[in-house]
Amino acid sequence: MPQVELSAGTIDYEDTGGGGPAIVFGHGLIMDGTQWRHVIADLRTDFRCIAPTLPLGAHRQPMRADADLSMRGVAGLLGELLEHLELSEVTLAMNDWGGPQLLVGSAYDERLARLAICSCEAFDNVPPKGPAQLLPYIARMPGGIAATMLPFRFDRLRRLPLTWGWLSKRPVPKEVMDRWFAPATTQPGVRRDLRKYILSAKQGRRELVAIADALRRFERPALVAWAGDDRMMPKDHGPRLAGLLPQGHLEVVADSYTLIPEDQPATLAKHMRELMAR
């Protein structure tokens, strides 16, 4: 897997290559780019698909101790990657983690051509409603993150509503979940990074509320794909986001929880192809 040295540390990324328009995929907390594997398998024939592993708990190498791992800091790493790979006219896709929205109106804004906002944190929903809202409190306790990760070692516990059960309707394959959860269950440095991000939740909430003004000025094509049965992202946030974006187009994806790339990848890939044609 290719790697790149960014300001916070070494980041792994997948790159399908090719000369087509670039799509960069942002992933969720304690996940990596394999969250998009089905969608990428569909799109890679026509588009260059790039999926970095950001320091959100599934990264293999701990970041530098002084790294800014707030929501804005991690979003900045995504921007640094665009710059390092000399990408322009990028379609930026996101799901679960809402941080990529912070690139709109930033120093990296001119590299963006389109947005694909797919059931993710928005406005004041940080951390998202449900069990995740306990994480900032747990992270303040000594050993809290290590204790939180213990159930993720066991297959049966991963599907409980208090762990992963509300993220996808359909089970994520064991080997994919093993890949996601191994770093934070085995590496203290990765848990330190994850804790640092979680403790910045209040700051991230303020920044996602404030980004609404920048979204209003994003005069480029934008897809808002919202899961029809989402348990964690409020149903009204999809229409609100689409209404903010001057060229926003809303698609409600039926029979899906938050992880649309897991539950309805073919439908999402179809909507993304339509976005790329705009």
List where the protein language model places each region:
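Conserved HGGG/HGGXW glycine-rich cap/lid loop of the alpha/beta-hydrolase fold
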Residues: 15-61
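Short, hydrophobic alpha-helix immediately C-terminal to the catalytic nucleophile
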Residues: 37, 102-103, 269
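A short loop-to-beta-strand scaffold at the N-terminal edge of the catalytic core in hydrolase folds
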Residues: 6-15
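Generic recognition of short, well-ordered alpha-helical segments
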Residues: 34-38, 129, 236, 240, ...
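Flexible "cap/lid" subdomain of the alpha/beta-hydrolase fold that forms the substrate-access gate
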Residues: 29, 57-88, 97-244, 251-252, ...
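Catalytic active-site module of serine/aspartate enzymes centered on a nucleophile-bearing elbow/loop
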Residues: 247-278
